[in-house]
Amino acid sequence: MKLQLAAVATLAVLTSPAFGRVLPDGKYVKIPFTKKKNGDNGELSKRSNGHEKFVLANEQSFYSVELAIGTPSQNLTVLLDTGSADLWVPGKGNPYCGSVMDCDQYGVFDKTKSSTFKANKSSPFYAAYGDGTYAEGAFGQDKLKYNELDLSGLSFAVANESNSTFGVLGIGLSTLEVTYSGKVAIMDKRSYEYDNFPLFLKHSGAIDATAYSLFLNDESQSSGSILFGAVDHSKYEGQLYTIPLVNLYKSQGYQHPVAFDVTLQGLGLQTDKRNITLTTTKLPALLDSGTTLTYLPSQAVALLAKSLNASYSKTLGYYEYTCPSSDNKTSVAFDFGGFRINAPLSDFTMQTSVGTCVLAIIPQAGNATAILGDSFLRNAYVVYDLDNYEISLAQAKYGTGKENVEVIKSTVPSAIRAPSYNNTWSNYASATSGGNIFTTVRTFNGTSTATTTRSTTTKKTNSTTTAKSTHKSKRALQRAATNSASSIRSTLGLLLVPSLLILSVFFS
C-alpha cells in the first residue's frame, strides 16, 4: 500500500501468531505470519447495478499483526505495510461503520474507554492511498503492545473517519510520514518527522539498525516471516546483492529517497529452450509488500505479451493467451544490474472463469514507476535497509530447515554491492527491446543464478459478484505524489467491500 502512488490489491489476510518477539541477546524482532485464504472471508455480496464481474481473487493478500492498545487493552488487527510510514487505527464512531461496512472484523479503538490515552490535538492526521481508501483523525499516544513487546510511546493516529475496515502499521521511510509529506503538512507549511515503528524499535534498543528482512515464502505455503534488525541466511540461495534506492523526487526538494524505489535494469523470459531479453531500458521500480500484483510500464508489458503470443482483450482489459501446461517451467527474469531474480510465469498468470488465461502484470501508461508487489516479492528475499537507503536482494529459498539468523549492526551481513550498483535510473524512457540481461548474471560462485523449481500451476479466478462502492476517494496533496494511480484505476475497478479489496474487470 503506497500513499497515493500505488494501487493496492488485497484480499487474503496474513496474520501473525503470538510468538513474534524481541530476542534480547540477538537484538532483533521476529514477526512470523500465516496466510489466510480469500475463501475464509465469506461470500461477496451482489453488485447493486447487477453487472457481472471478472475477478482476480486467488493471489490477493496482505500482512497483518495484532496490537493491544489502551487501558484496559483493546485488540486491533492492522496491515503491515512497507509503502507507508504511519501507524493508524480505526476509531469508534466512524460514519462508514454499520450501514456500509463491518468495522468489528479487525477491531476499532474506543479512546474514551482507555484511561491512559493522551490526544495530541495539535497533530491532525490525514492519509489517502492509491486504492481510494483514506483515513482522517488525530495523533495521540497510549499503552501499546505487540505480544510481549512494549511499544508505549510510539505515536499513532486514531481515525474518526475512514472507508477502510482495518488500520495500517506503516514501516516505510520516515519521509513518507503524513507529518512530513502529507496534505496537512503541506497546507500548514510545517513538516516534521517522528519516530515511526522501525525508528522506534531502534531508538528503544530493540534493534541495532533500522532495517528488516522480508520472506513471503512460496505461495503454496501458509507461513512467512519478517525480521526487524536481522537477516536469516537460510531463506535465500546464492549471493545477497545490495543496490541503492533511487530518489525520484529530488527535483521537489527531497535530499534522500522517499520510498523503496530501486532500478530495474532489464526484463527477460526464460524457457526450457532459450532465454529472451525483453528490454534493458532502466525503469524505477517500487518494492511494495502492500501491493499484491506487479505493475510495469505499458511498453514493457507489451514486449512480454508479444513474447508469449498474447493479445490484448478489450473485453477483459488484460492480455489473453493460451494457458501454459502445469509442467511449464517458463519464468520471468528481473535484472537488477548484474544479478537476476527469477519468478515463475505462473505467478503472473491467472485463469478466467471461462478457461482462458490472462497476464496478471498490470500495464501503466506514461512515465510510470514499476511496482513489484507480492507476485514478485515472494520469489525474492528482501532486506530493507532504511539507515543506508539500500535494498539487498537474493533468490528466495523455500523449504529450509534450521534458521541461520545474523543481526544487522550497521550494514547487511554477507551482502555485497551489485556489479552495476552505481548504474542507476535517472530519467524516464519508453521501454524498448534489445540488449542481453543473461550475460551479466553473477553469484558468489560465478555461476548463473539458479531458476527456482516451483509449481507452475495456473491460479484460477472465481466468477463472482460484489457490492459497488459508493464513496469518492479523497486525494492527499503529497509532494511525493507525482505518479497518480489513475492509469491503474482505469484498467481495474478497485472496489472496497467489507474488509476486502477486489481487482475486477467489468463485462458489458
From Swiss-Prot:
The active site is at D81, D288. InterPro entries: Aspartic_peptidase_A1 (IPR001461), Aspartic_peptidase_AS (IPR001969), PEPTIDASE_A1 (IPR033121), Peptidase_aspartic_dom_sf (IPR021109), SAP-like (IPR033876). One of its GO terms (biological process) is proteolysis. GO terms for cellular component: extracellular region; fungal-type cell wall; plasma membrane; side of membrane. The keyword Aminoacyl-tRNA synthetase does not apply. Pfam families: Asp. Residues 63-394 form the Peptidase A1 domain. Keywords: Aspartyl protease, Cell membrane, Cleavage on pair of basic residues, Glycoprotein, GPI-anchor, Hydrolase, Lipoprotein, Membrane, Protease, Signal, Zymogen. Glycans are attached at N75, N120, N160, N163, N275, N309, N328, N367, N422, N445, N462. Residues 448-476 are annotated as: Disordered. It is found in: Cell membrane. Residues 1-20 form the signal peptide. It is an enzyme of class 3 (hydrolase). Its EC number is 3.4.23.-. Induction: Positively regulated in response to cell wall perturbation. Its main location: membrane. Residues 21-47, 484-508 form a propeptide. Can also be processed to start at Phe-54. Residues 448-468 have a biased composition (Low complexity). A lipid is attached at N483 (GPI-anchor amidated asparagine). It is a lipid-anchor; GPI-anchor. Belongs to the peptidase A1 family. Cleaves proteins C-terminally to mono- and paired-basic residues. Required for cell wall integrity. This is Aspartic proteinase yapsin-3. It comes from Saccharomyces cerevisiae (strain ATCC 204508 / S288c) (Baker's yeast).
